[in-house]
Amino acid sequence: MRKPLVGINMKNYINTRAQTSEWLEATIPLLKNFSDVDTFIFPSMGTLETTANLLAGTSFGFGPQNMAPEKSGPLTGEFSVESIIDLNANYVEIGHAERKNLFHEKTSEIAKKIKLALDEKITPVVCVGEEVRANDTNELKNALKKQIEALFQTINLAQWENVVLAYEPEWAIGKASSAETNYIESAHQALREIIRELGGDETLVRIIYGGSVSKENAAEIVRQKNVDGLFVGRFGHKPQNFADIVSIVSKTKG
């Protein structure tokens, strides 16, 4: 059985060590009764060491919002997987829409990052999702299949179980409301079908939804069979809000 998972991406909103410490010190105690749900945070890159120190000895996972496609070398401004390992981090975010749209990351580069993370025993949270809303389930599956085939063509089949897919339809990111629940479930089901068609064991892969997640829609979303958790954005900047989401997932999926 797949363990429920809730994560938060701080992007570049909470950027100082003091702010990050305040958020974590407030949040950690609020999660003590939810051991049935895995949690992780992608803090602002400049606060990773602070995050590592505060989360040492806890089950709260963390990692950077991006990583280099190579272990080391002339890659100015990149973040090495060696640094991730040195921090005792266990997750890395890969392929977010903003990385592709603002920094022009290519699919081939993202695929290399995924493979490198898996080879180094770091769990990649891989962001996938169509740019525009699909008109029907076939169109939706075709759009997702094109992405998945390109991103995961080099991984070993056994590595699928260590992948987390974050389904974030680009047209729903940062909007006032999420995609409709039946649309979300159709996308998650399609992703499982695609994994199976590629030879992976879709029953082991955790797929979480991100895109305008809130307390108001969390239960309805995670009630869906193929949704394993949630990827929270700005709504989770208040510690109690994030804890409330974890609580909802625990009650709904537990």
Curated annotation (Swiss-Prot):
GO terms for molecular function, please?
A: triose-phosphate isomerase activity
Subcellular localization(s) per the UniProt record: Cytoplasm
Which reactions is this enzyme annotated as catalysing? D-glyceraldehyde 3-phosphate = dihydroxyacetone phosphate
Residues in the signal sequence: none
Kindly tell me the pathway this chain contributes to.
Answer: Carbohydrate biosynthesis; gluconeogenesis; Carbohydrate degradation; glycolysis; D-glyceraldehyde 3-phosphate from glycerone phosphate: step 1/1
Its Enzyme Commission number(s) read 5.3.1.1
Question: What UniProt keywords are attached to this protein's entry?
Answer: Cytoplasm, Gluconeogenesis, Glycolysis, Isomerase
Q: Where does substrate bind?
A: N9, M10, K11, G174, S212
Q: Name one GO cellular component term.
A: cytosol
CDD domains, sorted: TIM
Gene Ontology process terms (BP): gluconeogenesis; glyceraldehyde-3-phosphate biosynthetic process; glycerol catabolic process; glycolytic process
Family indicated by similarity:
Belongs to the triosephosphate isomerase family.
Q: What does this protein do?
A: Involved in the gluconeogenesis. Catalyzes stereospecifically the conversion of dihydroxyacetone phosphate (DHAP) to D-glyceraldehyde-3-phosphate (G3P).
Q: What is this protein called?
A: Probable triosephosphate isomerase 2
Which gene carries the instructions for this protein?
tpiA2
